[in-house]
Curated annotation (Swiss-Prot):
Protein name: CTP synthase
Binding residues for L-glutamine: G351, L379, G380, M381, Q382, E402, R470
The protein's annotated pathway: Pyrimidine metabolism; CTP biosynthesis via de novo pathway; CTP from UDP: step 2/2
Swiss-Prot/TrEMBL GO biological process terms: 'de novo' CTP biosynthetic process; pyrimidine nucleobase biosynthetic process
Membrane-traversing stretches: none
Task performed by this protein: Catalyzes the ATP-dependent amination of UTP to CTP with either L-glutamine or ammonia as the source of nitrogen. Regulates intracellular CTP levels through interactions with the four ribonucleotide triphosphates.
Residues at which ATP binds: S15, L16, G17, K18, G19, I20, D72
Note in the entry: CTPSs have evolved a hybrid strategy for distinguishing between UTP and CTP. The overlapping regions of the product feedback inhibitory and substrate sites recognize a common feature in both compounds, the triphosphate moiety. To differentiate isosteric substrate and product pyrimidine rings, an additional pocket far from the expected kinase/ligase catalytic site, specifically recognizes the cytosine and ribose portions of the product inhibitor.
Gene Ontology CC: cytosol
Gene (name only): pyrG
Assigned keywords, A-Z: ATP-binding, Glutamine amidotransferase, Ligase, Magnesium, Metal-binding, Nucleotide-binding, Pyrimidine biosynthesis
Organism from which the protein derives: Helicobacter hepaticus (strain ATCC 51449 / 3B1)
Amino acid sequence: MAVKYIFVTGGVLSSLGKGITSSSIATLLQQSGYSVSILKIDPYINVDPGTMSPLEHGEVFVTCDGAETDLDIGHYERFLNKDFHKKNNFTTGQIYMSVIENERKGKYLGKTIQIVPHIVDEIKSRIKFAGEGSDFLVVELGGTVGDIEGMPYLEAMRQMKHELGGKQVISIHITLIPLMRAAGELKTKPTQHSVQELRRIGISPQILVARCEKNLDKELKRKLALSCDVDNDSVIVAQDTQSIYKCPLNFLEEGILTPIARHLELGELKPKMDNWDMLVKKIIAPKSNITIGFVGKYLSLKESYKSLIESLIHAGANTDTRVNIKWIDSEILVDNLALLYDVDSLLIPGGFGERGIEGKLEAIKYARIQQIPLLGICLGMQLSLIEFARNVLGMSEANSIEFDPQTKEPVIYLIENFIDSQGGVQLRTHTSPMGGTMRLGEYECHIKKGTKLYEAYGKQTLIKERHRHRYEANPHYRALFEKNGMIVSGESNGLIESIELANHPWFVGVQFHPEFTSRLQNPNPVILAFVKETLAHKKT
């Protein structure tokens, strides 16, 4: 069958859950037996989010092929239990860069370059490329209808509907139905205005998703259907819920597949959601609970750690455990070590820069001495080596050259002649451009037999995990570390990929980011092992 396109837009305001809605629709179609892909379009002019502050953008999600993408790509992978790639996310910056490069090469034969047709044609080309090989492509447009940045994309959507027809392209619009608490009344006017704005552009949505705090009655649904020119069964309620993973089940119950099937001329859709339903029930009402101390520095925007938070939920669902996160600000921890006393384990996530480092080092020292489970990820692993070097090996000046370029004991250093995932050699220095110059994407890791990592990965000796870092553990110190009980449990082409303490119940550090490959139906092995170990050592 020809690829069918489902365009998802948002109105009234941002952060309505377009990513979760897109993921949920794609999941229901996938579980109905179709092959489904998703594309996220980001209208900002940055080439990618790789150099954006986590506090500005949230998490940067890394795909298996090394793309630094929007965090919604993480939702897509976690819901559909499949890998996505560079082609599944593009920005206005990439569109303009491509068009300008083509103009410089003379590919437009001297014509004046304009938004229409050149920019819009490039957008349509990338949308179609993302859908190749799939039955469905769900396209999520970031931002809000009416934003000037989104206009070329809406024009591209309008043209695709005109070119391909209503049996191959549908539009789903998500809006907010605010609750006026003083009157206890839901208001539909913002939604009506949002749809009017979309129709002025030339797009009439076939399905309306109403995000709201409480359910809509039949009269409100009828009113929305009439004013927004959609069928009565095409007003779908997206009510606030206890878990994002319940959303596909809620949409299924609301009947969203009925108008989708009708407009795209599909047969009856019967998704198989039994296993999904079972896991959701374990998220909402688990038998056990644990508390993990999450020592970070981007705590004012917890979406900076989105994949890691979700990976703990996945591990919890698969162990029937509620994972409670105690957020601990590493910048205030040095003078407040009592914050660590009531947690069952500690998690030290990745990050960049010197701010908050001393607090993380104190947390690592506490876990090492008190024998409580610890998982250090990326920077967390590097700091575990620095803490061990300073407090066990007596190397008081041990540091990373990221924090002290002149350190006499560079336990963590920068590889200048770096071999990337395609086998190419990149020259890297402190002055190299920030964007795209890190170790990015999926790399192999050889695991040492008999280690905790070996057990976590089901006694596999070769795994693949994703990376996003610039600095590495210095192999010059490896023999000294191992002689004193810090085991190198994983490596890749001579690079140290994972470490663990010999005389400790569970003290593991990994240079890769296991959270990027965790899925609800397939939790990452090292995250799952960490949660299981935390449960085993839970404080009574």
